[in-house]
Amino acid sequence: MTLKVDVKTPAGKTDGSVELPAELFDVEPNIALMHQVVTAQLAAKRQGTHSTKTRGEVSGGGKKPYRQKGTGRARQGSTRAPQFTGGGTVHGPKPRDYSQRTPKKMIAAALRGALSDRARNDRIHAVTELVEGQTPSTKSAKTFLGTLTENKKVLVVIGRTDEVGAKSVRNLPGVHVISPDQLNTYDVLNADDVVFSVEALNAYISANSKEGASV
């Protein structure tokens, strides 16, 4: 089964329709798989530069603070022991790599599941362009997106060369703009609606489907 989505223009008119291949937009979402891929994606974003010093790495504390016996106090060997102010940290974080290895087929399958979920709920839109003309206009882009969906979180997918479109939406709150080769499971699931330019949709379908796109 091939889904069809009307192609909208900034003027509010319908300029034909685009077919969404079932192999990309009509598969059964695997919740566990999408969770695994999103977790790995977020983990890869972590810097992992956190670092604490152990008692052996903290400066100072080389001299025994007081004699072993006869003071009535607990014996201490260094003022850099964890129980002292300014002492080392016990089992504190050290620099590490949080990235997880995720097979490409799993990443692609999770993305297909996420897009299929949005497509089934009529939350995938296709547009000819975001604004008319060659001058960026945030106001016009905001108005146009408002005619497509009332939801606040929108993922906009446009071609890398569409600077006018990118500049028009990049400052809109709740709107995230990416190119088709950057399309990923997290961004799709994090957005309420996904808006493709016809160019970007064709590029994504052509790269991931044997049939390609047809408008």
From Swiss-Prot:
GO terms for cellular component: ribonucleoprotein complex; ribosome. InterPro entries: Ribosomal_uL4 (IPR002136), Ribosomal_uL4-like (IPR013005), Ribosomal_uL4_dom_sf (IPR023574). Residues 43-100 are annotated as: Disordered. Keywords: Ribonucleoprotein, Ribosomal protein, RNA-binding, rRNA-binding. The keyword Lipid biosynthesis does not apply. GO terms for biological process: translation. The keyword Ribonucleoprotein applies. One of its GO terms (molecular function) is structural constituent of ribosome. Belongs to the universal ribosomal protein uL4 family. One of the primary rRNA binding proteins, this protein initially binds near the 5'-end of the 23S rRNA. It is important during the early stages of 50S assembly. It makes multiple contacts with different domains of the 23S rRNA in the assembled 50S subunit and ribosome. Forms part of the polypeptide exit tunnel. HAMAP family: Ribosomal_uL4_B. Part of the 50S ribosomal subunit. This is Large ribosomal subunit protein uL4. It comes from Mycolicibacterium smegmatis (strain ATCC 700084 / mc(2)155).
